[in-house]
Amino acid sequence: MTTIPIFFTFDHHFVLAAGVAFHTLLEKADARYHYNLYVVHTDLKPHHMKRLQHVVGRFPNAEVAFIDASEYDTGWAGLRHKSHFSKEIFYKLTAADLFPQYDRILFSDVDVIFTDDIAPAYFLFPDEKFYYAGTRPIQENNNLPRYRAHFTPEEIQTISQYEISAGFMLINLKLLRADYRQPQLTEFFRRNVDRLILPEQDCIALCLAPDIRFLDYKYVVCAAQYFNDPDQLRYNPNNPLLADRHAAAACYRKMLREVVQLHYPGADKPWNHPLTPRFDLWIRACRHAGLMGYYLQCQPQFLLQRLKRYNLRRFIRKHTGHAQ
């Protein structure tokens, strides 16, 4: 039986989200394949692992393993100006070392639900040279003006053409090892961490272009995108497939119909904020996963996190106002 490996990286705050994501992934899994799920972490406790093992254990063609990545914390601890990044992003760049037993692997965030099988993505680009594959932005990138102060025009152009979402990726581990590209990625990250905007995407684009491939848009669809009018959007000008507005709108509608991974980006998540777009889909998935009791148990923790974020925003606004 062919094995489909996929890894995730998160801390203990995302155990509930991971349980829901894992259950939806395996509900849609193809019975012809065996799915090996890996969790790269540094702070999960045995009871966290047991909960996730219970979810995955319901599916005969799947298993979950946990990789303690503490050895990478030494390098992470020495980085400057990293406070606005989660260290989990660093592990996405070190997959070739973390998984020496595989030639390729999938990666996914856990603030997601899956509505179709991920296996077809694993077999893409069989005869092409590539290091990473992911979805490129379908809408115009509003982050690019932020790059002008820290990146050269040539770097900005490369990022514009080769930026991919780091929320779902296919990674060619065999080629990364053969070409010794992982050390280049991690060294670039260390040297440039103070200027990176979207750290994984920036590193991948600037270090590995043009050997990057693009997945179908259906592999990462953000929940809020369901509330956009496809005929009124500003589309990514770097994608020639979107040059015609009618074709672009048709592509957008097709993406929404065929979504594989539904992503909930941002600080407000469906497990901590019931007004999150497409909350209904996530809470239904939570019930199907048998995790409603855990969802209710976690609410005080999530409320405390929201209060901390709220107080931090008030503090920043207050002191920014005084500075003005």
Residue ranges and their predicted role:
Residues M1-H23:
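N-proximal low-complexity "stem/linker" segments adjacent to membrane-targeting elements
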Residues M1-I4, F10, A166, I171-Q324:
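A glycosyltransferase accessory/donor-loop signature
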Residues T24-Y33:
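Short, acidic, metal-binding catalytic loop of nucleotide-sugar glycosyltransferases
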Residues N36-D43, G134-T135:
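Short internal beta-strands
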Residues V55-L98:
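Active-site-proximal specificity loops/subdomain of glycosyltransferases
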Residues I105:
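Short aromatic/hydrophobic "clamp" motif used to bind/position activated sugar donors
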Residues S108:
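Catalytic metal- and UDP-sugar-binding loop of GT-A-like glycosyltransferases, i.e.
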Residues V112-A149:
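Conserved donor-nucleotide/metal-binding helix-loop-beta segment in metal-dependent transferases, i.e.
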